[in-house]
A protein has these predicted regions:
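Core of folded catalytic or high-affinity ligand/protein-binding domains
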Residues: 1-121
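Long, solvent-exposed, polar/charged low-complexity segments
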Residues: 96-156
Length: 156
């Protein structure tokens, strides 16, 4: 709720759950926290790799994130603004780090992070969860990527 308020206070629109029982956005947001990534385009791209290689999930549940109406609208706006070339530049800049996540970091984990995690995890220390799952987050240097600037950018 704090992040949602932050977005609203700064003229941004928070995503809304598909229905009142859904925890999809909470689960996605928690994955940013557990893997130590912000919400920039570059770090969203890195998070995709963590999710695919370092998480346990049902593909249909994970894929339902792309069906959120606000995300579809955001994707259209982004494509219109930066174009396909901008997306290629984005992925070109993150590929080395994505490979490190896929072939080094995620393989060293003790067990996969459950994307749809139990509610009780929200009451635990992040450092304890990272230790339990063997999650080693990227260093600031590893996350220092060339950023795509667009109107939806915001500092985190």
């Amino acid at each position: 709720k704090v992040y949602e308020k932050y977005l609203i206070d700064n003229g941004k629109s928070p995503l809304t759950e598909l229905d009142e029982r859904s925890t999809l956005i909470r689960d996605h947001d928690a994955s940013h926290v557990i893997f130590g990534l912000d919400t920039s385009l570059e770090e969203e791209a890195l998070l995709d790799t963590w999710l695919l290689c370092g998480c346990s999930y049902k593909f249909s549940y994970l894929a339902s994130y792309a069906k959120l109406p606000e995300l579809k609208e955001l994707t259209k706006k982004l494509l219109k603004e930066v174009g396909v070339t901008g997306f290629f530049k984005l992925y070109k800049s993150v590929i080395p780090t994505k490979l490190k996540i896929a072939f080094k970091n995620s393989r060293k984990m003790k067990k996969k992070w459950p994307f749809k995690h139990p509610e009780e995890f929200l009451d635990r220390k992040i450092s304890d969860l990272r230790e339990e799952f063997g999650i080693k987050i990227l260093s600031p240097k590893e996350r220092d990527l060339k950023k795509v600037i667009w109107s939806g950018s915001h500092s985190t």
